[in-house]
Amino acid sequence: MGQKKLIKFAAIKEYNNVLEFPQDMQGKWAAFFDALKKGTSTIDISSLSISDGQFVPNVSSINKEDNASTPLTLELACGRGEYAVGLGRMFPEQHFIGIDLKGNRIWKGASIANKDGLKNVAFVRSQIELTSNYFAKKEVDEIWITFPDPQLRWSKSKKRLTHPKFLRLYQQFLKNDGIVHLKTDSPLLYNFTLKVIELYDLHLIYKTDNLYAEQNIDPRCLIKTYYEGLDIAQSNKIHYIQFNIDRDLPLALDEILKETIKDIPMDAGELLRMEAEAARAKKED
């Protein structure tokens, strides 16, 4: 690991707004943000108290109406956390958490949040697969998935963050009317997600295959990430979907999905990307 990465990993261990694989946090995020807003002292996560002796109430003692009125939004596979930070600036009365495994990327967003005094923005270093360990049932209001790896190979479709395997995971902590947002430059991931929504009869709120050509764009969609700027898919279009996971996703349909997604085509840019990835993997071998 390079020296710069080591420095960033060491830094986030000292940041109050970054938790790494946190334990015993289900239902306690309102208390955590309350502690974060009280000052810069080290937060003792195990008891949700501040080490200088100041008391921060457990989630059970927080006014339930206040807790319920503070929406909690996750940015999954957040990378540098542009969305968590951007949304935190837009909505200072709400709470935002970016989740990613790569600490050197999280460092960027966490550093900006600290510098700008955004006490409503935090980060969790973890695999997405573990998120149900960190949030209680119906604790999360919205999920943003922005420019994730589209996992172009058919054999890796289960790794796509809108695959039913992941939607079942999100359903464990997302509110019944909670919204999932997907923003991507990958036509394949966009069409795959629409296929999932259709097959499992989920509630589609909004879709567009050319976001910036739309009238009256949601200001939240104007936040741009580092990966959007790269335009890896070379599609020249940004695709966007809003939907609810408003019903159970039968496992029996997974096999049907497995067969139907074979017919979803890739555009030229995605084919080039897949060829480049294959060449890189071969070189590494």
Predicted regions and their residues:
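A short acidic, Gly/Pro-enriched loop at the edge of an enzyme's catalytic core
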Residues: 133-142, 147
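Class I SAM-dependent methyltransferase "Motif I" SAM/SAH-binding loop
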Residues: 77-81
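A short glycine-rich, Lys/Arg-flanked "PGG" loop and its adjoining helix->strand segment in the class I
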Residues: 162-176
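Conserved SAM/SAH-binding beta-strand->alpha-helix loop
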Residues: 102
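S-adenosyl-L-methionine
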Residues: 112-137
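Conserved SAM-binding loop
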Residues: 109
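SAM/dcSAM-binding transferase cores
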Residues: 1-65, 208-285
